[in-house]
Regions:
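Receiver (REC) domain active-site loop signature in two-component systems and cognate sites
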Residues: 65
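C-terminal output helix
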Residues: 98, 116-125
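His-Asp phosphorelay/catalytic-motif detector in bacterial-type signaling
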Residues: 55-57, 81-87
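Two-component/phosphorelay signaling modules centered on CheY-like receiver
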Residues: 20-39
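Acidic, metal-coordinating helix/loop segments flanking the phosphotransfer/catalytic sites
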Residues: 40-58
Length: 140
């Protein structure tokens, strides 16, 4: 796990990508820019096990993964896990509109295209975590 330097109010993020260099790159960006502790998964099976056992504030998920693939991981997370409502941000080289639309229909909350633009990634993750933590308001 890669931990944020500031220990106050850290967020837990699961990063799923089959390329170790990409996992580490994403984790470093988030640890240095946001208060994030990153858990890294290199396989779909590992991602499903982690998502099934631990709650996260956000999940970054690559689509093109060996094994069952990113779409199936997304569907399983949305079907039954402690992360059923956790924001899932797709991180992929596939950047066409049809792929983005398919991801949103499958339950993704946001999409960041590779190559990663640091500011875009940080803004997207920050917005998704903030949106999840907004208190619900009730009418009187």
């Amino acid at each position: 796990m890669i931990q944020a330097k500031n220990k106050a109010t850290r967020h837990r993020v699961l990063i799923v990508d089959d390329e170790e260099s990409m996992r580490l790159f994403l984790a470093r960006i988030l640890a240095n820019s946001l208060k994030v502790d990153a858990t890294l998964a290199g396989t779909c099976e590992q991602a499903l096990r982690l998502a099934g056992n631990y709650a996260y504030d956000a999940i970054l998920l690559d689509l093109l993964m060996p094994g069952v693939g990113g779409y199936e991981v997304l569907r399983e997370i949305r079907r039954a896990s402690p992360n059923i409502a956790t924001p899932v941000i797709i991180v992929s080289v596939l950047s066409d509109q049809a792929t983005k639309d398919r991801c949103i229909r499958a339950g993704a909350n946001a999409y960041v295209a590779k190559p990663i633009e640091r500011n875009s990634l940080v803004a997207t993750v920050k917005a998704q975590i903030a949106g999840r933590r907004k208190p619900k308001t009730t009418g009187s």
